[in-house]
C-alpha cells in the first residue's frame, strides 16, 4: 500500500512539473505568423507554438458592439479609466483615474501631447453589460480548461503609446475594432536589456524604456534588442504569447478589444506573481490624483464665499451710511 501511495505521489509531482514547464516555455524567434481563418484545432496548435500570430478573423459582433463609437453613443455617462503615460513609474500616486466617458473622449481628442490612454476598464464592461457581449462571442478564442477570462477596451489619444510590457496570461488576444494602430514586439530574451519594473499592485511588468523614442540613458542597451514592428487593422486579431514584450501606438479615434485567458495550470505556474500581488495590495496606499484638484476646487469655493461675504458687508455698510445721512438731513421749512 505504501508503495502505491509513493507511486501516486511521484506521478502527481511529475504531472504538475511537466505542466509548469510547458507553461514556462517561450519562443524567441523574431518572426510573426499570419494565418487566414484557421479551424479551432489548427488555432490551438498555432497558439501552442508560442509565436506571435496575426489571425485573419472577422468577428463582426465583437467589432460592431465594442468599437469606441458604439460604446460612446450608448454608454457616454459611465466612467472609464484613464492613465498618463508620463506617470507610469510615479509610485506615490494612483495609476488610474476614473472619468465619465464623454469627458474622457474630449480629453483624448484634445490631447496634443500624446500623453493619455484608457485601459483597465473591466468595471465599465460589467456595469454596462458589454462583458456579456465578449463572453457570448469569444468561444473560439478560449483555451481548453480555461479558469479566468479578462476583457478590456483600450484606446488612446493620437500618437500616444502604451508602456513596453509583457503579459503572463496563457493567451492574450488584441482585436482592433476601429482605426489602425502600430505594434512593436520584442522576444522574452530581451528582458536583460529592458530594466524590468515589477508592479505587483497593478499586476504590470513593464520597462521604463520608450521603444518608439528611446531615452538617451537607455540607448546603448536598447540597441541590443531586436524588435518586430507592424500595423494592425480592423479584421485582424493579434495573439501575443506570454513573456513577449509589446507596445501599442494609437492613431486618431482608434480602439482595441482585448481578451486574456488563464487556465488552472497557468494559475499554478504564476502563483508566485499572484502571491506577491496579494501582499502588495494590502500593504500599499497611494495618494489619489484627485487630491490636488479637490484642494483647488475647495480653495476656489472659499474664495468665492469670502468675496460674497465682503460684498454683503459692503452693501450693509452702504445702507447704514444712507440711513445715517437721511437722519441728519433737516426738514425743509
What are these regions (language model features)?
Residues 1-237, 245-311, 316-333:
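N-terminal accessory scaffold of Fe(II)-dependent oxygenases
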Amino acid at each position: 500500500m505504501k508503495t502505491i501511495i509513493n507511486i501516486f505521489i511521484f506521478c502527481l509531482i511529475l504531472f504538475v512539473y511537466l505542466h509548469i514547464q510547458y507553461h514556462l516555455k517561450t519562443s524567441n524567434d523574431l518572426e510573426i505568423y499570419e494565418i487566414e481563418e484557421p479551424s479551432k484545432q489548427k488555432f490551438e496548435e498555432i497558439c501552442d507554438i508560442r509565436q506571435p500570430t496575426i489571425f485573419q478573423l472577422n468577428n463582426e459582433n465583437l467589432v460592431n458592439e465594442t468599437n469606441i463609437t458604439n460604446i460612446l453613443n450608448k454608454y457616454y455617462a459611465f466612467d472609464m479609466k484613464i492613465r498618463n503615460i508620463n506617470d507610469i513609474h510615479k509610485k506615490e500616486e494612483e495609476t488610474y483615474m476614473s472619468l465619465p466617458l464623454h469627458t474622457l473622449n474630449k480629453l483624448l481628442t484634445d490631447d496634443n501631447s500624446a500623453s493619455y490612454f484608457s485601459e483597465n476598464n473591466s468595471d465599465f464592461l460589467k456595469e454596462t453589460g458589454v462583458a456579456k457581449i465578449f463572453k457570448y462571442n469569444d468561444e473560439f478564442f478560449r483555451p481548453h480548461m480555461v479558469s479566468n477570462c479578462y476583457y478590456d477596451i483600450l484606446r488612446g489619444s493620437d500618437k500616444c503609446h502604451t508602456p513596453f510590457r509583457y503579459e503572463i496570461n496563457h493567451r492574450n488576444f488584441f482585436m482592433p475594432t476601429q482605426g489602425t494602430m502600430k505594434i512593436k514586439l520584442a522576444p522574452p530574451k530581451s528582458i536583460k536589456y529592458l530594466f524590468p519594473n515589477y508592479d505587483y499592485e497593478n499586476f504590470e511588468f513593464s520597462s521604463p524604456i520608450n521603444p518608439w523614442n528611446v531615452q538617451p540613458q537607455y540607448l546603448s542597451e536598447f540597441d541590443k534588442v531586436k524588435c518586430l514592428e507592424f500595423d494592425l487593422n480592423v479584421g485582424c486579431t493579434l495573439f501575443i504569447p506570454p513573456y513577449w514584450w509589446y507596445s501599442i501606438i494609437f492613431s486618431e479615434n482608434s480602439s482595441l478589444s482585448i481578451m486574456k485567458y488563464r487556465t488552472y495550470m497557468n494559475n499554478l505556474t504564476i502563483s508566485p506573481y499572484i502571491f506577491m500581488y496579494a501582499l502588495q495590495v494590502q500593504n500599499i496606499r497611494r495618494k489619489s490624483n484627485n487630491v490636488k484638484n479637490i484642494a483647488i476646487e475647495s480653495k476656489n469655493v472659499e474664495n468665492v464665499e469670502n468675496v460674497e461675504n465682503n460684498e454683503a458687508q459692503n452693501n450693509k455698510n452702504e445702507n447704514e451710511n444712507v440711513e445715517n445721512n437721511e437722519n441728519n438731513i433737516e426738514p425743509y421749512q
